[in-house]
């Protein structure tokens, strides 16, 4: 019942170039194993070893793109996870902070990093946000507190507010890309869903 994706809703209704996939599912329930499978040829059906799998940055580079990876999820340990290993293969890799903790920086901290992208090149950019990850009430600034929280700080209202903030962020990325970077395509997906009563 929450109108927490107004920009996406408008684009869905008014822009024939936008494609939305309903009933999408994740290949796993946690970030690292999901992105291993979503961003490489490894998948839940054959479970090819990650280190033997081409990833999306490998493919983009082979196609002649200059690659960038910007993340608000922390480094995790530079060589400790598949995500960090994949990110480090980009031509440019930047994190909003250099450790893994649930970020105290809002995802908009990634927006200035887009200004470092050379618009004269063919660019492939991965932007890894915190989005609506647990501790939803920590994921958005006060001005996005549209719905008053109930008795639980990580309940539906906080989750809806975090979705509203992500919707705004996507609009900023899209607008900047169209105006400054010759944006040709943009894909957004959540790496996994959330069970609000279990916080994951």
Spans of features found by a protein language model:
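Active-site rim elements
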Residues: 44-47, 154-163, 174-175
